[in-house]
Each structure stands twice: as structure tokens, then as C-alpha cells.
């Protein structure tokens, strides 16, 4: 795998200054900030003793207001603003993730304990939605590989399946009229994708506790894939030898595949993927248009995972 070449850019240079300063102030009082954001429950201060990692991009980050108010999270509603408006009753603590299947050491793990166990990094990634819009987000989290190593996958395990929580009493989209999706929301990766150093379990963004509308308290971030692969509010991770289906693949297999790698050469049946709207930019309605990069700009790191594959057939 080619070595990662981080651009020479500091966090204070890519982040709007007022947000950067607020984040550093937050880090000095993480417990109070986390409790205020989560409401119920006591969040771990260790969650935000994050260190900046080599994983950065030489691009301006999306304003936190846009990151937290322009979301797809159908468990809370169909509109981009619904997750922020309708997730106030969702309780992200206490929270546990069950890891089972083809592993030597299955278990159910408290998220706060995982945050204390694994070093939390700050990673700034591009995020490309399949709907042809994008953001640049500074996440806080730990590699999924760290959790997988803890449970020791069997040699026969080839895939990793993920499952979102089902709480219709707190997630109005799960009991609303939009029932073309079967709950729980599910996703999957190949095991080598899941173990890749870029693949992250995020517990925060912009140095703060992960908001409900962004997938609290723990979500997946796979920056070279379309955003729907980033399953939110995870409650179960299963190692298997069978390729798992994902929710959108089941719902519309002609439009959504298992891999969902960002590919400007493979259009969605209803729109082009050659370019994207960068949310929070200076263009029309606050979005600027730019060419989409193969694998969302991470080709040097991940293209070898798909050597010899037909990327049009395996979309």
C-alpha cells in the first residue's frame, strides 16, 4: 500500500478560526461540554483528548453549522433538516455495541469504555454523498481495526456487517410514512476494507461530542465511499463469511451496490457523479461545484484493494 503523504497544513489553518478556538476551549472542559450535548448520562472526558493524526486534506472544512444541519438520517425524517430538528428525544447514553459472529472473543462493549481504551484521533476527511454533494469534516474517533483486533476475527471471516439501533419512540422516521426502508438500517464492508487504516469509528466531530443528527454516539466513516456507507448509531457489528446486503442495495439494487466507492466515471442512473456541490462554499445557495475525485481523493491509499475488479460492475 502506498504510504500516506499528508499535506503540510495545520488544523488551525483549515478550520475557521472561531471554531478552532472554540474547539480548543472545549477540549479544556470536555466533560461539561459532552454532558450538555448528550443531556442524559455522563459522557467521558477522555473522548475528546484527541490528537491530530496524519489524516488531513488541504481543503477548507465545512462550517459546523452545515455539518450539523444538512444531513441524511432517515430514521429522523426525509428532509435534510429533519435530523437536527427531530432528534432531540434520542438518548445516546448509555450505549453498547455488540460484536459477534466469526470472532474468537465476541462481546458487548460500552462505548464510553471503548473511548477510554482506544486513543482518539482527529482526522479531517472529505465526505461525498451519493446525491452529488460533499463536505470536509474533522472527525474524532478510532480505527475500526482496533475494535476488530480486540475481538480477533476468525480466518474464515471475510465481511463485516453493521446494524443501526431501532427506537421508533425516539426516531420518528422509523414509525412514519416512509416505510420503503426496512429497519434496522444495515451496512457492510469487506474485512480488508474494514481493517484499512482510513476506516474510522467516529465518536465526535469538530472536537465535540457527536451530535444526535450525525449518528451519536458512534458511527462509521469510510471516506473513499459514498456517505450512505457511513452507518450511524451502531448497535451491532457481525463478522461473517457471506457478503451482507446494505439497506439501499436491498431497496433499489439497480441504483445502489455493495461497494459504493466514489467513482466519477460511473454515474447514478438518475444523475452524473462527475462533479459535486461542496456544501458551505461560496457558490449558488452556499455551495460551489467541483470535479469529483476517484475514490474521493483517496486512490493512492485504497485503489489496490480493488485491483483487477470491474468497478462499473462492482459499484
Swiss-Prot record:
Organism per entry: Rhizobium etli (strain ATCC 51251 / DSM 11541 / JCM 21823 / NBRC 15573 / CFN 42)
Keyword entries, A-Z: Metal-binding, Molybdenum, Oxidoreductase, Periplasm, Signal
Gene Ontology cellular component list: periplasmic space
Cofactor binding remark: Binds 1 Mo-molybdopterin (Mo-MPT) cofactor per subunit.
EC number(s) given by UniProt: 1.8.5.-
Protein's name in the database: Protein-methionine-sulfoxide reductase catalytic subunit MsrP
Matching PROSITE patterns: TAT
Sequence positions that bind Mo-molybdopterin: 71, 74-75, 129, 164, 214, 219, 230-232
Gene Ontology MF: a single term: oxidoreductase activity, acting on a sulfur group of donors, quinone or similar compound as acceptor
Gene transcribed to yield this protein: msrP
Amino acid at each position: 500500500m502506498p504510504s500516506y503523504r499528508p499535506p503540510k497544513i495545520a488544523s488551525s489553518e483549515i478550520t475557521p478560526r472561531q471554531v478552532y478556538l472554540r474547539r480548543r476551549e472545549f477540549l479544556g472542559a470536555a466533560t461539561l461540554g459532552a454532558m450538555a450535548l448528550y443531556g442524559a448520562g455522563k459522557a467521558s472526558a477522555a473522548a475528546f483528548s484527541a490528537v491530530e493524526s496524519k489524516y488531513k486534506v488541504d481543503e477548507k472544512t465545512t462550517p459546523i453549522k452545515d455539518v450539523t444541519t444538512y444531513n441524511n438520517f432517515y430514521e429522523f425524517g426525509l428532509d435534510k433538516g429533519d435530523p437536527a430538528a427531530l432528534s432531540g428525544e434520542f438518548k445516546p447514553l448509555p450505549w453498547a455495541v455488540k460484536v459477534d459472529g466469526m470472532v474468537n472473543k465476541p462481546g458487548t462493549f460500552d462505548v464510553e469504555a471503548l473511548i477510554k481504551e482506544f486513543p482518539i484521533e482527529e482526522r479531517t476527511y472529505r465526505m461525498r454523498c451519493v446525491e452529488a454533494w460533499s463536505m470536509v469534516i474533522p472527525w474524532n474517533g478510532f480505527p475500526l481495526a482496533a475494535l476488530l483486533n480486540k475481538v480477533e476475527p476468525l480466518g474464515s471471516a471475510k465481511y463485516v456487517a453493521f446494524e443501526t439501533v431501532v427506537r421508533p419512540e425516539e426516531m420518528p422516521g422509523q414509525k412514519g410514512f416512509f416505510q420503503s426502508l426496512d429497519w434496522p438500517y444495515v451496512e457492510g464492508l469487506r474485512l480488508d476494507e474494514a481493517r484499512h487504516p482510513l476506516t474510522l469509528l467516529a465518536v465526535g466531530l469538530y472536537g465535540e461530542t457527536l451530535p444526535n443528527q450525525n449518528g451519536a454516539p458512534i458511527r462509521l466513516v469510510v471516506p473513499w465511499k459514498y456517505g450512505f456507507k457511513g452507518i450511524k448509531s451502531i448497535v451491532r457489528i457481525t463478522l461473517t463469511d457471506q457478503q451482507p446486503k446494505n439497506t439501499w442495495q436491498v431497496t433499489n439494487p439497480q441504483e445502489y451496490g455493495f461497494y459504493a466507492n466514489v467513482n466519477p466515471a460511473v454515474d447514478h442512473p438518475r444523475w452524473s457523479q462527475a462533479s459535486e456541490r461542496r456544501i458551505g462554499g461560496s457558490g449558488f445557495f452556499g455551495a460551489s461545484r467541483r470535479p469529483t475525485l476517484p475514490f474521493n481523493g483517496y486512490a493512492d491509499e485504497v485503489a489496490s484493494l480493488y485491483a483487477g475488479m470491474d468497478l462499473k460492475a462492482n459499484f
